[in-house]
Amino acid sequence: MYICAALYKFVELNDYKELREPLYQTLIANDVKGTLLLAREGINGTICGTREAIDNVLNYLRSDERFADIEHKESPSDEQAFYRTKVKLKKEIVTLGVDWVDPKSSVGTYVDPEKWNDLIADPEVLVIDTRNEYEYAVGTFEGAINPKTDTFREFPEYVKQHLDPEKHKKVAMFCTGGIRCEKSTAYLKEQGFDEVYHLKGGILKYLEMMPEDNSRWNGECFVFDQRVTVKHGLEQGEYDQCYACRMPITAEEMQSEHYQKGVSCPHCYDKTSTEQKERFAERERQIQLAKARGEKHIRDGKLESLS
């Protein structure tokens, strides 16, 4: 059994470049895989390893007083959820593309999972899913609005086009683990919205804490690792993922004539060229050869990025 740990903290890191190598070496020494992002504004990422290994990495982080109170969310995985270990230097730990937004100085009101149902049931509250469209398609909260964004960078434009602080007096937002809402609520506060709320700990904490029979969540939750999706109780979901377009796909979609493992699916069959399909097919062949040898291909096509 492996443990996936999602973590983030907005904190001033003027020496973030110097933090990279010792953090990377700590991950390697403990055989922990995944991606951590470092920027001047903080740290963000998801890692996976054994119980002991994850504890070692968290203890290492918390030995730095700036990370002493860093929170993390855990979920189980039957196998290693990542194939590589990466520590990246970034301009932002989650990319909104608006330099002046600072969650350390202004952020929305946190709402605990056990109080979330009552909040989103209020007809005066506008509930917005701040994730990308392919994430929304897999599952979301009852009554939530889909901004139809392909990246988080598009969210400010959505706000500009569709939200008005004079009209929308109460806004509640949610995302996978909470980090996107740190920035989206900070952005709305700066735009003059007064009552802005966000789900503390994100969807993952809600699915961990709320019994399914008392839940207002419909579907599964997309995660950026080999599990693809998780369900209530953070159990692994039923979706797979298409290598070509990175879209989550159902068992039914895998029965489509347009589905070929590692090559295409109904979402992308008409969007890739013959040359691309041939390249994907060769890559899938190499993956299967590696598996036959009892090895893991360095990248098996499932999404490892954070957005």
Curated annotation (Swiss-Prot):
Q: Which branch of life, at top level?
A: Bacteria
**UniProt cross-references to CDD domains, sorted A to Z:** RHOD_YceA
Q: Which organism is it from?
A: Idiomarina loihiensis (strain ATCC BAA-735 / DSM 15497 / L2-TR)
Q: Name one GO biological process term.
A: tRNA modification
The record places the active site at: 175 (cysteine persulfide intermediate)
Q: Which PROSITE patterns match?
A: RHODANESE_3
- Family membership: Belongs to the TrhO family.
The catalytic activity of this protein is classed by the Enzyme Commission as 1.14.-.-
Q: Where are the transmembrane segments?
A: none
Reported function: Catalyzes oxygen-dependent 5-hydroxyuridine (ho5U) modification at position 34 in tRNAs.
What this protein catalyses is:
uridine(34) in tRNA + AH2 + O2 = 5-hydroxyuridine(34) in tRNA + A + H2O
Which top class of enzyme applies to this chain?
oxidoreductase
Q: Where is the Rhodanese domain?
A: 121-215
Could you tell me the keywords of this UniProt record?
Answer: Oxidoreductase, tRNA processing
Which sequence ranges form a coiled-coil region, renumbered to this chain?
none
Give the protein's recorded name. Answer: tRNA uridine(34) hydroxylase
Q: Which Pfam families match?
A: Rhodanese, UPF0176_N
Recorded GO molecular functions are:
oxidoreductase activity, acting on paired donors, with incorporation or reduction of molecular oxygen
